[in-house]
């Protein structure tokens, strides 16, 4: 661990230091140089977003390299449960048959500053908080039943039963997921809160067998006509919306 920290962080930090300061590169858009699909920033040279924080010994060694200006102090600020907040916001925008009265109670709890989203869902669904948190995050990241079963150490049948119970008791989360996926499938675009476009312009065959996603013309030639293909990765639409808005 110490050797890894030395080669991954310390060497890189020293390499890019200039007059005792570090000026890393931030990437707001995905490119060969970095960036993320959702529009979240990444950094490099060095990656100051990944400075170790968990191991107490390594954390002290590496974070101790950074000191504030004389007479100044560091401040640490972070958003509280930013992704769940956005998820609740978008659930509250649902209308018609997609809207469920339960979401209004969740919004009220957020307004009162009393919200623990994962516990709220756990209470509504009647499942342990750990399971609720895993399903909540899995919903935002497009997790399948197999991976859910593996993480929670359940059989696929048990994971399926858990998801069915979750969707029955907390229908507004399934509704926003399905609506976002449907939007991405039909238009190929979803927009984040500030208007950034997240495009779904790759295609795959409609069969559930895994095949490589391709641009439309290539997919038509490879998989046998426009009627046999669909937009790829639309199951990630909710994740793109939440991460991109955050």
Task: Provide a role label for each language-model segment.
Residues 1-246:
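Conserved catalytic core of nucleotide polymerization and phosphodiester-bond processing enzymes
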């Amino acid at each position: 661990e110490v050797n890894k920290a030395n080669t991954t962080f310390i060497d890189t930090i020293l390499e890019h230091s200039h007059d005792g300061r570090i000026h890393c590169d931030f990437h707001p858009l995905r490119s060969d140089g970095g960036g993320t699909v959702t529009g979240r920033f990444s950094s490099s040279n060095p990656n100051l977003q990944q400075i170790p924080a968990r191991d107490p010994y390594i954390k002290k060694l590496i974070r101790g390299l950074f000191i504030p200006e004389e007479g100044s102090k560091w401040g640490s600020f972070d958003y509280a449960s930013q992704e769940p907040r956005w998820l609740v916001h978008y659930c509250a925008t649902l209308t018609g048959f997609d809207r469920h009265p339960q979401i209004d109670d969740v919004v009220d709890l957020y307004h009162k500053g009393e919200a623990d989203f994962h516990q709220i869902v756990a209470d509504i669904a009647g499942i342990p908080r750990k399971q609720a948190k895993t399903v909540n995050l899995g919903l935002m990241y497009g997790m399948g039943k197999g991976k859910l079963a593996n993480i929670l150490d359940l059989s696929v049948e048990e994971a399926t039963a858990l998801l069915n119970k979750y969707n029955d008791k907390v229908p507004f989360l399934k509704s926003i997921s399905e609506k976002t996926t449907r939007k991405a499938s039909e238009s190929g675009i979803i927009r984040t809160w500030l208007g950034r476009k997240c495009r779904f312009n790759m295609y795959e065959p409609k069969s559930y067998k895994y095949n490589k996603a391709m641009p439309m013309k290539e997919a038509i030639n490879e998989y046998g006509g426009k009627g046999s293909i669909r937009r790829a990765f639309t199951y990630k639409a909710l994740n793109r919306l939440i991460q991109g808005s955050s």
